[in-house]
Design a protein with these regions (language model features):
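Extended beta-strand/beta-hairpin segments
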Residues: 1-53, 57-146
Length: 146
């Protein structure tokens, strides 16, 4: 299965601007620019924000799968909420995503802290987005069972 998105950029790096769209239409001509990426402007998105969204959603689904494999049926998984923070930093070889912090909270019926932490670590290592960054980015997991 291939997921598709497209980007259009017009102009120079600092003065230009672009739009991002997904094949599903969930994003349609979403704005992005140098200012949104490097100067904190709030009038658009950034590639790193989209990575954060992808990683948070991928991890949450992977955690649900790991909990299911551990015997926690769907009726016992009330909620998994994950926030991802992606750090873009200047390195010797240019800008790079250097760190991703996953903060996840889960409401589960009848799960022990040990079961939850094991499933969360397996999800962190098994999530396809985590695998994409595993060899070149620090991935930190903060997992809380409520």
């Amino acid at each position: 299965m291939a997921s598709k998105a497209s980007a259009v950029w017009n102009g120079s790096l600092k003065e230009g601007k672009g739009t991002i769209s997904t094949a599903t239409g969930v994003l349609h001509n979403a704005n992005y620019s140098f200012a949104t990426r490097f100067e904190g402007a709030s009038s658009g998105t950034t590639p790193e924000e989209m990575i954060a969204a992808a990683h948070a959603s991928c991890f949450s689904m992977a955690l649900s799968a790991q909990l299911g494999a551990a015997g926690l049926t769907a009726d016992r998984i009330e909620k998994i909420e994950t926030e991802a923070a992606v750090t873009l930093a200047k390195t010797e070889s240019g800008f790079a995503v250097t760190r991703i912090v996953l903060n996840t909270k889960a409401k589960l019926k009848g799960a022990t802290k040990e079961e939850f932490e094991k499933a969360a670590n397996e999800a962190k290592n098994g999530c396809p987005i985590s695998k994409l960054f595993a060899n070149n980015t620090e991935i930190v997991l903060n997992a809380t069972l409520e």
